[in-house]
């Protein structure tokens, strides 16, 4: 095989919900084979209770036990894959096709991350696991796997043009991947006729029209100031990313099929190029999520904080696969000076008068900073001298302070990170009203509908 083609194919990542398995797992390499084997035994036992055909996964896990016992150097890799199987169990146990598809893709993304895609798989057992998981898409119980994803996205929204495209794509997805799976698993050699039939049934442009329509929706919605449209846009981003990866599932299975033949390298290289182009297009479409301009802020107020909803969490795991830089990861636990961009010498402080507590801008250096803490729901709470800040949005919509520990949704703040390094700040109650400092002698902190300009851009120091 041409080294350039081989290199390109090895670089092919498998798909979806890319989760950095290495994050947050200390000392994985120090785990013993007995610990891994005990974990595998527990997983096999739990998989027997799942209402799905997981026999192939169970057999693969048994093979992995033998692997780590014979070759301890594989422990860290096997541990990563085993962890992904364990984290997917809850999704499998629901019996819901949507969750089962998501669980399958979690496992596949772990393999892609750990072994650098299908061409990097160095263990026969892991290759078997890959094949077993992909095979779930083709089984009778999951022939509506794509349909379930689409239906989930359209529970609250109607888009007849897009629905028509999705119906056309869903009719082919499972049949094609089932055919490819069966051919790839054959013990006998694949004939030229079978290869011709398989490749003719899988177009490298599969889903392209549909994805193009969703891209158009996202490009328009990314700058909307309408709350319903902003939320719709975030939901469609999730659908878009799922379907983009489903497309790559098809093409990746075709790559594996071609690899088994040991020929047609140029054809495989063309498929790889198509996947690369698709990934770049997706990257360009969603890049604004992590490089926000003020015009994107209303959409950003539904995406951030990243871990506040299943949709945002799902989108975030996709963004790594499609090469987006991570958004700012400030922990927001501590005391900060919240400085204004328009008046850099001014920052948020608080004044009290006759029992009322109002937040305003101060220019003196020694004023107290704002204590920012993260709530369990991912939103932020701002406190200064024992008073929690909250916002109103009527004609006199200022930032007030309350002694209540829970300021309510008017005081659950969202920090939307801008490409400039500043933040726009809104609330869970009113995502499209942003905190700004008014142009007056007092410089009171108030809320403004949509983009307040530089007076509503804030820096934390």
Swiss-Prot record:
Residues 25-31 form a propeptide. Nematocytes. Contains 2 disulfide bonds. Its main location: secreted. Coiled coil: none annotated. GO terms for biological process: killing of cells of another organism. It is found in: Secreted; Nematocyst; Target cell membrane. The keyword Lipid biosynthesis does not apply. Gene3D superfamilies: Pesticidal crystal protein, N-terminal domain. GO terms for molecular function: toxin activity. Residues 1-24 form the signal peptide. GO terms for cellular component: extracellular region; membrane; nematocyst; other organism cell membrane. Keywords: Cleavage on pair of basic residues, Cytolysis, Disulfide bond, Hemolysis, Membrane, Nematocyst, Secreted, Signal, Target cell membrane, Target membrane, Toxin. Oligomer. Belongs to the jellyfish toxin family. Type II subfamily. The fraction containing this toxin and CfTX-B shows potent hemolytic activity. This fraction causes minor effects on the cardiovascular system of anesthetized rats (at 25 ug/kg), since it has no significant effects on heart rate but produces relatively small increases in mean arterial pressure. This is Toxin CfTX-B.
